[in-house]
């Protein structure tokens, strides 16, 4: 995997990689056999230097965790979408937007867009997303883990999208958009009761800290009980393209 953070930069041109310009941060992956992927990590403008046909996979930003006096909610992961067989014209600018993760006490994630596709950010916590967030009630009297791969989370409102959140919707693809965990705190670290985060970037707990969703996964942030507790932010989204397959 090759990362670039320069602006602008001409990437590709070796092996199976196409030549292109991109104004943001990205990573290129050579899958072998003439196959390739480009992961867009920050927003920017993509310009292919030759005509190409691509598939695109998009993940919206995850929601932040939310804390209440007697309960905690993990943020849901961002929604995902896959678009196939998109024709791109050489020397044409294509805008790519990477959705921000939600912040504060349960803030919603932002949408990711590009290449005719849009993936919505997760709704405000507790709310719908790619995979639902965890739920924790007073002293662990209710402990429900977060969802992953499109599954529902712990509360009735923390629902998943009901379809896979794997890359390009394929069974071998990496997981994205996991729901965030939830922690109830009473009496210091020894008093923490925790509902697990979902696979695919959901934020967990470390000591007394509610962790954010992982960057560029659309994972939900961890929620921690208490109206003044610092909540885990949602993970930013991502846009990935590959040669059409």
Task: Give the label of every model feature segment.
Residues 2-245:
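Low-complexity, glycine/proline-biased repetitive segments and flexible coils/loops
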